[in-house]
Swiss-Prot record:
PROSITE patterns named among the record's database cross-references: TRYPSIN_DOM, TRYPSIN_HIS, TRYPSIN_SER
Gene name per UniProt: Gzmk
Segment forming the signal sequence: 1-23
Species of origin: Rattus norvegicus
GO biological process assignments: granzyme-mediated programmed cell death signaling pathway; protein maturation; proteolysis
Protein name (Swiss-Prot/TrEMBL): Granzyme K
Propeptide segments, given as residue ranges: 24-25
């Protein structure tokens, strides 16, 4: 996000990606039943979780563009619940290619495809999450966000186990208002805000790239926010609009043809 003077930080575990404090952990949530979210991916650098992601094709993961970093021996882990345990259902992949959206710049268009070097083996613990989103989510809609991010706003370490929290969609008009983000950043039509009126439920550091699911539909990706768990600074998400879905389909088309 173009977070100018209000200083926002992307939700990347262990790495501050922009100004001063844009977040990425699950605040106020709970641990999910192990392996009940089989579409979740952990993007890791040198074996350390940095961002979440979503498996949308056996060889493709969708995540946030700001999760990209040169070097660092990047891998993607599928089928995980605990990041530290040697779970037999885990599948680990080298990354063949990072493809950020061509319009990504300082947070706008914060979406990226990752092509795995080999295709995942789909089974009970590793499954796809299909794109069925529309351009609009009604204000007040309850949604779930999932990730391995921090669980306390003042502790910047990731959660070992997968967490989930229910957040509420906040209208773009309100999120851009003076009492919220005041257009720093501007919440565009390709973005959406979600949080909690009391600031008790939020995404935060380490959750970037994970899914926002509303009534069973994959609508958005975690992007960032100002710190964590602040009522008038909710999480900011990349909305999976028609523009992005068309781009995704164009990139996946050659893979589907094989």
């Amino acid at each position: 996000m173009s977070f100018s003077s209000s200083a926002l930080v992307f939700l990347v575990a262990g790495i501050y990606m922009s100004s001063e404090s844009f977040h990425t952990e699950i605040i106020g949530g709970r641990e999910v039943q192990p392996h009940s979210r089989p579409f979740m991916a952990s993007i890791q650098y040198r074996g350390k979780h940095i961002c979440g992601g979503v498996l949308i094709h056996p060889q493709w993961v969708l995540t946030a563009a700001h999760c990209y970093s040169r070097g660092h021996s990047p891998t993607v882990v599928l089928g995980a619940h605990s990041l530290s345990k040697n779970e037999p259902m885990k599948q680990t992949f080298e990354i063949k290619e990072f493809i950020p959206f061509s319009g990504f710049k300082s947070g706008t268009n914060d979406i990226m495809l990752i092509k795995l070097r080999t295709a995942a083996e789909l089974n009970k613990h590793v499954q796809l999450l299909h794109l069925r989103s529309k351009n609009y989510i009604r204000d007040g809609t309850k949604c779930q966000v999932t990730g391995w991010g921090s669980t306390k706003p003042d502790v910047l370490t990731t959660s070992d186990t997968l967490q989930e929290v229910t957040v509420t969609i906040i209208s773009r008009k309100r999120c851009n208002s003076q009492s919220y983000y005041n257009h720093k950043p501007v919440i565009t039509k390709d973005m959406i805000c979600a949080g909690d009126r009391r600031g008790e439920k939020d995404s935060c550091k380490g959750d970037s790239g994970g899914p926002l699911i509303c009534k069973g539909v994959f609508h958005a990706l975690v992007s960032g926010g100002y710190k964590c768990g602040i009522s008038n600074k909710p999480g900011v998400y990349t909305l999976l609009t028609k523009k992005y879905q068309t781009w995704i389909k164009s990139k996946l088309a050659p893979s589907s043809a094989h």
